[in-house]
Every structure is written in C-alpha cells, then in structure tokens.
A protein has these predicted regions:
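Conserved beta-strand in the GNAT
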Residues: 54, 60-68, 75-80
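Conserved beta-strand-loop-alpha-helix junction that forms the acyl-donor binding cleft
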Residues: 83, 111-121, 137-145
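Conserved acetyl-CoA-binding loop-helix of GNAT-fold acetyltransferases
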Residues: 81, 87-100, 122, 126
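A conserved beta-turn-beta hairpin within the catalytic core of GNAT-like acetyltransferases
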Residues: 68-77, 86, 105-107, 132-137
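Conserved GNAT-fold acetyl-CoA-binding loop/helix
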Residues: 21-44
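Conserved GNAT acetyl-CoA-binding A-motif
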Residues: 102-114
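Conserved active-site tyrosine of GNAT-family acetyltransferases
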Residues: 43, 124, 129
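A short beta-loop-alpha structural element at the N-terminal edge
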Residues: 3-18, 132
C-alpha cells in the first residue's frame, strides 16, 4: 500500500470529522458519554487545516495528525488512523514528522492520551514520550525534541 501525506484543506473538514468519530467515539463514550452536537462544535472550533496533516491511500482518507503551538510546546491534539490501516507505520510517520518539527523549532512536544487507551500510551512511550502528569481521564505526556 502506498500512502500520501500532505497538509489538509478546508474542504476535507467533514471527512476528517467522520474519521475522528469512527476512531474516538468508543473512548469518549466510555469516559464522558458522546454528544454529537458538542463533538461537532468542539471539532469546528479547533479545526485548522494549517496544523493538520492528512494521509490518503489513493482517494481514501485513512489518517491524520492535528498539531497546535501552545507557547513553547508543539501540542499533538490528535493522531488518528483508521482501524483497517493501523500497524502499517502511518501513526509512526505522522508522529516522527511532528517530533522533527519540534526539533526544528527547539520545542517540547506534548500530548494527552486517554488512560483507557493503553495501546496509544505504549505507542507514544515506544517513541520516547514519558508520562509527566495526569488528569482524571488522561495521561499528560511529553518529549523534549
């Protein structure tokens, strides 16, 4: 399979939101309960194509990363990969790109991962991230790039 990576376009907002819902609904439902309107509003509030890298296999959106600058930190809002395309290097490629950007900018790279998503926490630890703090629902992780 060949994957292409590029910056998102405004016109992809709906497809990105659908992928977000597909992958994240189970975790969010278990922690807080899922509210369609709240999720759509929150997604729209934070949607910024300049901070989003999309991954396609041919014309199908199969993953994305969403990054924000927060002071002296490059913060990963989300790395999402379609379940049928997980464990094929997409998440690692997206994460390595963010870490490289952090190094260029001499910034720390941070993120939060749900405590119930043990697989994701292990993925980030494998890539050098450490748990620095926690909230009631998430681990706060960081990496000095």
């Amino acid at each position: 399979m060949t994957y292409s990576y590029r910056k998102a376009e405004q016109t992809e907002k709906e497809a990105i939101f659908k992928l977000y819902c597909l992958v994240m609904r189970g975790y969010i439902s278990e922690i807080w309960g899922w509210n369609d309107q709240w999720q759509e509003n929150d997604f729209s509030t934070h949607f910024n194509p300049k901070g989003i890298t999309v991954v396609h296999e041919e014309s199908e959106l199969v993953g994305y990363s969403h990054v924000e600058n927060r002071g002296n930190q490059l913060f990963i809002r989300m790395i999402v990969v379609h379940p049928h395309h997980q464990r094929k290097g997409i998440g690692s490629t997206l994460l390595e790109s963010v870490v490289a950007s952090g190094k260029e900018q001499s910034e720390k790279v941070g993120l939060e991962v749900f405590k119930i998503n043990d697989e994701a926490r292990k993925f980030y630890e494998k890539h050098g991230f450490n748990v620095e703090d926690e909230t009631s629902s998430s681990y706060v992780m960081g990496l000095i790039a």
